[in-house]
Amino acid sequence: MTTPDRPELPKTYDPAEVEPRLYARSLESGVFHEEPDPARPPFVISMPPPNITGRAHLGHGSTYTPQDVLTRYHRMLGENADWLPGQDHAAIATETVLIRELAKEGATRESLGRDAYLARAWRWREQYGGEIDEAFQRLGFGPDWERARFTLDAGLSAAVTKVFVDLYNDGLVYRGTRLVNWDPQAQSTLSDAEVEDEERDTFMWHIRYLAENGGDGLVIATTRPETYLADVAVAVHPDDERYRHLIGKNVVLPIVDRAIPVIADAAVDPAFGTGAVKVTPAHDATDYEIGQRHALPMPTVIDFDGRVAAPIWRYDETPERRAPIDAQAEKMRAFVGFDRFEARKRIVDELRVRGALVDEKPYRTKLPLSSRTHAVIEPLLSLQWFVTVQPLAQPALEAYRSGALRFVPERFGRTYAAGLENIRDWNISRQVWWGHQLPVWYTPDDDVVVAHDEDEAKRVARERYGSDELRRDPDTLDTWFSSGLWPFSILGWPERTPELDHWYPNQVMVTSRDIIFLWVSRMVMLGLRFVGKLPFETVFVTPLVFDMHGRKMSKSLQNAIDPMVDLVPKYGADGTRFGILRQMRLESQELRFDERYCDEAKRFATKLWNALRYTCALPEGLPGAAVLPAREKLTLADKWILTELRACAETVTHAYDGFAFGVAADALLQFGWYTFCDWYVEATKAEGQQQTRGAVLSFVLNTFVRAMHPIAPFVTEEIWLTLPHDGATIVTASWPDLAEIPSFPDDAAVFGAVIDKVEQLRNARSEWAIAPKDWMRVEVPATLSTERGIVETIATLARAQISTYDGGDGSVRDRILAVRGVADTTKLRERYTREIARLESEVARSEKKLANESFVAKASADVVAAERAKLEEYRRELDRTRAALAALGD
């Protein structure tokens, strides 16, 4: 037990001075580092690796702070707790930044060459990759920095290569032409996670396709007239009576004069537009599925640069099916070479001239945008590498259905299951250079060789094809492929390591809802496939962060918050963390951030600091250890605060166990600020408290800051180090043991009644306009004067002069204290009488209104409920005012 000398504490708590000093102390001591220890139960979290291009934002605060809280909590429980950090190479995001920088120099990645380009990318990573780590340290995050990994580390790259090769050898990786998300600016495919929908104003164009036999045909509705040049059918719902007579017949595309069939497909929504939709399989995901069901040809008329092109065939098609489509090239020449949106204008103008444009209506639509370049995504057919996911998805789905994998909140398990039930093959190749290059080589005849390295590839090529002349595929793997291996690759897999043996599976994964399918499901699929175990037992889904008005934060709305600029400098890391978590609720997936919670948290730290200064300045000094006096020596106030402390510690423990961080923060604030500082600290100033207060104050503070430490690590450490304590740091201190916190429910109830009476007296002081400096004169039943500490506490907390009177019914809670003050009771009596008359009138009016059956029947439910609420409030005010008048006496 360390007992500090009586310290000279600063008058104010300064996070800007304390937090960097204590964090440096933690780093120097190595307290965040762990080794696998089979003697202790593991608690491990693999940090979702942030992008090296990223800056810390509020989303990081809501996602990573809970991970730090959980790790600190489980470490204090004595578990082998470790939080494993790392960073993601963020292939497309990083490449976008680098290409932009090269453009300023008049260069491209091609002019630089692959090797020189990658060398520059690594230099860029070394220069800027540390920014996110620095931000995390300023937020007080304590992962095991010695174990930090990067998704392009040699060991992780070896794991990625092994998984690709094994999946290929098992027949689950293949090369094929499929519809993909194409970013014309990044010149790469994108995963669904890298595509963001944004609402935009556009038009719905109604275009007439005449019947092949010269009839009226039908009118289709589309928001993308530029792709109609690749239409191969018009689809209608099979039950739509308007078009049943046309099913199986042909209509003719205007301008290019090509006949296409009318087909029936249940995917068509009869209520959308005209109920007839153009089918362009090479440029729309739904159309692609329709095209596959009906075996339609799939010509492409937009190239990889986003420009209209003569029909392109990205797969083998029969000459007979190609011929009529290829023949239209001459008639569409006026549009070829133009950007797709410029071509749209020209096509619409031409349709208008030809009389084929029937209508043009304003329409609000969702456009798919690249999250990296903000370019509009173009669905395109492309030859890419894919994973056949269904054999991997089924075990992952069964793990959830069996209860082996759980989600908090539970509803997100359904999101996970729905994604796996409707899963499609996974496009894993990207046309970028920064990333894990595909372990794929091609012979001069385009035969495929998949191998772990070039030497193996050449050996295989010689054995199979008699030559080792090879060229490597320039593409890299989807970032989510390497991220899917994260929980086991960072533990040394495929090697059998102590870390892998003891720390896999992890206990929890903390992430956001938007990547449940894209990342969580892939970690589960690959973990089960290659390690034979789930990667984690629980997935905790954090809320998305919005502004106070429920709007997404963005620069354009001028509501974006940078915690490193806008929060930490003002409120400190503790205030920022506490403020964020206080607003986090399991029942809501919208965290509508209100900065006032951070300000309140900072003031809370100041409140605790002042309580510490008071405790350390007690004339009787502090005990040599954080131990309590004998029970018989404890006062009523002591017993009350210990009972409340135990309840607080129990609530916080259950909250941490259940990921209810907002509940934990509420309980800590309620106890620390109001129960402890506002009531107990003040109560210790009463006569009769001197003998025990130092020990109780020290014990309560020591216990409380340990319970609060996971959320607010710095102020709790500073307080803990000032008090008598065991160990070198609160980081490794033990979690409060409920068995060591005594509880006195009966005595606590008595003191709770005293607090109720003091609050009544404080309200009376305000009502009667008694100045804070003036003493109140209070009469209490004579029976109270014999109960230890009650009268003295009332006198101290209410600033009252106490006298007694005969009477009372023997119950502290039920006794009414007769109060005499220094106010002008005549004027008060007149004021209360007028207020009672007004309130009686309002009650009568409201009762009459609610008794009117016509009002109740015709008014909305909200209006009736509001009137009932007003009536209840009037009644409460009336009772309170009558009680205040009665308290004045005769």
Describe every region a protein language model picked out.
Residues T2-D239, T280-D316, R344, L351-A396, ...:
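N-terminal, positively charged nucleic-acid-binding surface of large information/translation enzymes
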Residues P4-L9, P48-A56, R114-L118, P143-F150, ...:
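Glycine- and acidic
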Residues S26, G155-Q187, E194-E196, R208-L210, ...:
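Gly/Pro-rich turn-and-neighbor structural signature
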Residues G59-T71, G78, Q87-D88, L156-A159, ...:
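Structured ligand/cofactor/substrate-binding pocket environments in proteins
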Residues D88, V180, P184, L190-E196, ...:
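Acidic, turn-prone loop/beta-hairpin segments
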Residues Q127, F136, R603-C616, L636-A647, ...:
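Core structural elements
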Residues L369-T373, V545-H549, M553-L634, P724-D726, ...:
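Catalytic adenosine-cofactor/nucleotide-binding cores of aminoacyl-tRNA synthetases and other
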Residues T722-D890:
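C-terminal low-complexity, glycine/proline- and small-hydrophobic-enriched intrinsically disordered tails
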